[in-house]
A protein has these predicted regions:
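A cytosolic-side transmembrane-helix exit/cap motif
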Residues: 122, 146-150, 182-189, 206-213
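Interhelical loop and helix-boundary elements at the membrane-water interface
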Residues: 2, 18, 23-73, 114-127, ...
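Long C-terminal subdomains/extensions of small-metabolite kinases
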Residues: 130, 177-178, 185-186, 190-198, ...
Length: 227
């Protein structure tokens, strides 16, 4: 297939549906016979899986959500490289003609997770799947954002603060590291950051009112959080 727009659209749709797989919900039901949407924040991501179902389910959720994001990029990369634009398959050099294509793939996977069609277009908050796509897209930026996340959580004890820091840092890092990348790529990275911040709107409200829960590896919750 040599039509870049059609190929990107097909890869984006596939990535959206892969990104939409609700591993947190599936693992909670398999290992704990629990619907993690019924307690805590009601989210299907790693943090709520930890709070409701425990460290094992949370670790597996984190791993699988990261992997599904990475897989979307790793599948699309050689297909896009085969278009004949001369992209190096190992890097897909941001700044090359067509670098926006992988940006669209990254965005589609994150949107699939946040707006999962399997859950009536509800889902997670995009952090783990976002980490997966960015590590697969350009791992130095992914590791930098992960480091930013870890430092922010270590200082504040709030996972949401680390998540927001990483989300805001993504478009900044992408523009700083690749100032000559296409406007399309920059736009996709900005949209990922904006969407992840939007997905944390309830957390932002809780942080402002002092109701946000701090990270705990031992405390379990069985009831929905107070909003």
């Amino acid at each position: 297939m040599h039509n870049p727009i059609l190929l990107t659209a097909i890869c984006a749709v596939v990535s959206f549906f892969i990104g939409a797989i609700p591993f947190g919900l599936i693992l909670g039901r398999v290992f704990n016979h629990t619907d993690i949407r019924k307690a805590g924040s009601g989210n299907i991501g790693t943090t709520n899986a930890l709070r409701v179902a425990g460290p094992k389910v949370a670790a597996l959720t984190l791993l699988l959500d990261c992997l599904k994001g990475a897989i979307c990029v790793l599948i699309a990369r050689p297909l896009i490289a085969d278009l004949g634009h001369g992209f190096p398959v190992s890097i897909m050099a941001p700044g090359a003609a067509g670098d926006w294509m992988l940006g669209v793939i990254c965005l589609a996977a994150v949107w699939g997770h946040i707006f999962s069609p399997y859950l009536n277009f509800h889902g997670g908050k995009g952090i783990a799947v976002g980490l997966g796509v960015i590590l697969a897209w350009y791992w130095p930026i992914g590791l930098s954002l992960l480091g930013m996340f870890i430092v922010a959580v270590a200082i504040t004890k709030f996972v949401s603060v680390g998540s927001l820091a990483a989300a805001i840092g993504l478009p900044i890092a992408a523009c700083a590291v690749f100032p000559y990348s296409s406007l399309g790529l920059k736009f996709c990275m900005a949209l990922i950051g904006i969407t992840v911040v939007w997905a944390h709107r309830a957390n932002i409200k809780k942080l402002m009112t002092g109701k946000e829960s701090k990270l705990s590896f031992t405390k379990r919750v069985t009831e929905p959080d107070d909003q």
